[in-house]
Amino acid sequence: MSSLWIAIAAVSAIALVSGLILGFAARRFQVEADPIVERIDALLPQSQCGQCGYPGCRPYAEAVANGEKINRCAPGGEAVMRNIAALLAVDPQPLEGDGVQSEPQRQVALIDEANCIGCTKCIQSCPVDAIVGATRALHTVISDQCTGCGLCLPPCPTSCIQLVPVPTTTATWKWNLQTIPVHILEVERHV
């Protein structure tokens, strides 16, 4: 029984010394992050879609801090580009594309449920948890949460997911309520 206690004490001592060495090394060799990268990253929509050409919002924020174009974030659109321009004190640029400033047409993922095998690979790859389902069960996309990033397309083994444009209807139209005059009508109440 005493050899058991000796082994426990030896392993505990090794763990304690290793922890102290790692703690010292972490403080000694700590790399300070660039605060401008943190601020740019906070402005980005965090959809991790990769439409800017970078694997996520953080790498794109680092690239913008190093001089990359500020107009590549499609999900953020013009509002994010203008906020980044104000932060960096540079002129706003037209959104990436045909040189014309336009809002990209919103797309959402659509799953062909007849071909879905329920592998959950699309659920694991969705950065905003817009796909719901269970193993070996049908999956579906919550279109209000889907950013249209397309990260769910490559892992699908049956290619049953496609991006479809969202038609502009009264339900999907971006209403600017500040331009609509609102008048409050008095209503008589009968008791």
Swiss-Prot record:
GO molecular-function term, one example from the UniProt record: 4 iron, 4 sulfur cluster binding
Co-factor binding comment: Binds 3 [4Fe-4S] clusters.
4Fe-4S ferredoxin-type domain location: 107-136, 137-166
Cofactor(s) annotated in UniProt: [4Fe-4S] cluster
Subcellular location: Cell inner membrane
Family: Belongs to the 4Fe4S bacterial-type ferredoxin family. RnfB subfamily.
This protein's name: Ion-translocating oxidoreductase complex subunit B
Organism: Edwardsiella ictaluri (strain 93-146)
